[in-house]
Curated annotation (Swiss-Prot):
Residues 1-20 form the signal peptide. Glycans are attached at residues 24, 39, 102, 168, 227, 256. It is found in: Secreted. The gene is Serpina7. SUPFAM superfamilies: Serpins. It comes from Rattus norvegicus. Belongs to the serpin family. SMART domains: SERPIN. Expressed by the liver and secreted in plasma. Major thyroid hormone transport protein in serum. This is Thyroxine-binding globulin.
Length: 418
């Protein structure tokens, strides 16, 4: 079973003293989400969001050399788009330009409707695929946010809003951590350890994903200890899952890499990209929405003897400096402009925390099903087939089929490093 849990926090602080009456914001889940009429932006969003994902990936890879990389691009895009809804002037322009949108070509209303459509589509119930994305805003009791902002973020982003006493740091920290733990089904515990004073608003964005492999691995086929090359001088031992199955795959001669698609039983797929030794940076530089479209067109189904490591990794980032380097400067500066959130001056973005957890294993079946269940059409005599062994650094993407969204993106450098 393959499971992913993701958390993204935006922490905002006030530089000026706020004088206003306490605001009792509404609490509780948003249970309805109405899809807007489709517009031109909807058709551009998958490509724009994918290109943002790869730009952010390249920044994180440079900032975290030789480390595992893992994050949820679609969640970050949705959280920043939500933040842009309450921003103005150059603050808003920079946020949207970092995401890849040009306000000259894309009206703000169409953009917001596009994200509303995306979130509603991703949250659509499915018996075989657990996928839920949502937001929560924890607002200081002394701050009175604009009613329009509260209404809009509920309608567009399925956002829960909580009135929080940030003067009681330990209680506020416990409230947020409890919420995060509940929404990630216990996978992220105690996220915030040292909440600072003078924080007035925290935005939490989360995504929970759990899916079955369409063709689960047999536990009995897993090699308990197999070599995985971290670099030229380092080799680690990992459990290696093994299966002979028909997969869509493609050898990209131009980029010197092998691409393999593993389907989940519902509307999602995993894309593994294995560069030839010494060609990782070449592949990373070439990653784009056009590259994904090319691979999607050229993937061919055939028998593959596949070896995939069984592993768990997690990644935590403060994306503040990264987003500023990408061009989102004003939101973190004294000149930050958030007139759509509150009439009070001095509100700016202080932190942008991100945490993601990944587990990939053989199970791929519902609870209670036999772990030895396998493909019914696996041949007794192996036909002529390709062999793909993910035994060195590889790229990993999880995509949702209906919206063509990049749910998760990462690089596995060392599968033993959690």
């Amino acid at each position: 079973m393959s499971m992913f849990f993701y958390l993204f926090l935006l922490v905002l602080g006030l530089q000026a003293t706020i004088h206003c009456a306490p605001h009792n914001s509404s609490e509780g889940k948003v249970t309805t989400c109405h899809l807007p009429q489709q517009n031109a932006t909807l058709y551009k969003m998958p490509s724009i969001n994918a290109d943002f994902a790869f730009r952010l990936y390249r920044k994180l890879s440079v900032e975290n050399p030789d480390l595992n990389i893992f994050f949820s691009p679609v969640s970050i895009s949705a959280a920043l788009a939500m933040l842009s809804f309450g921003s103005g002037s150059s603050t808003q322009t920079q946020i949207l330009e970092v995401l890849g949108f040009n306000l000259t070509d894309t009206p703000v209303k169409e953009l917001q409707q596009g994200f509303q459509h995306l979130i509603c589509s991703l949250n659509f119930p499915n018996n075989e695929l657990e996928l839920q994305m949502g937001n929560a805003v924890f607002i200081g009791q002394q701050l009175k946010p604009l009613a329009k902002f509260l209404d809009d973020v509920k309608t567009l982003y399925e956002t829960e809003v909580f009135s929080t006493d940030f003067s009681n740091v330990s209680a506020a920290q416990h409230e947020i951590n409890s919420y995060v733990e509940k929404q990630t089904k216990g996978k992220i515990v105690g996220l915030i350890q040292d909440l600072k004073l003078n924080i007035i608003m925290i935005l939490v964005n989360y995504i929970h994903f759990k899916a079955q492999w369409a063709n689960p691995f047999r536990v009995s086929k897993t090699e308990e200890s197999s070599n995985f090359s971290v670099d030229k001088s380092t080799t680690v031992q990992v459990p290696m899952m093994h299966q002979l199955e028909q997969y869509y795959h493609y050898v990209d001669v131009e980029l010197n890499c092998t691409v393999l698609q593993m389907d989940y039983s519902a509307n999602a797929l995993a894309l593994f990209v294995l560069p030839k030794e010494g060609h990782m940076e070449w592949v990373e530089a070439a990653m784009s929405s056009k590259t994904l479209k090319k691979w999607n067109h050229l993937l061919q189904k055939g028998w593959v003897e596949l070896f995939v490591p069984k592993f768990s990794i997690s990644a935590t980032y403060d994306l503040g400096s990264t987003l500023q380097k990408m061009g989102m400067r004003d939101a973190f500066a004294e000149s930050a402009d958030f007139p759509g959130i509150t009439k009070d001056n001095g509100l700016k973005l202080s932190y942008a925390f991100h945490k993601a957890v990944l587990h990939i294993g053989e199970e791929g079946t519902k609870e209670g099903a036999s772990p030895e269940a396998g493909s019914l059409d696996q041949p007794e005599v192996a036909p002529l087939h390709a062999v793909i062994r993910l035994d060195r650094t590889f790229l990993l993407m999880i995509l949702e089929k209906r919206t063509r969204s990049v749910l998760f993106l990462g690089k596995v450098v060392d599968p033993t490093k959690e």
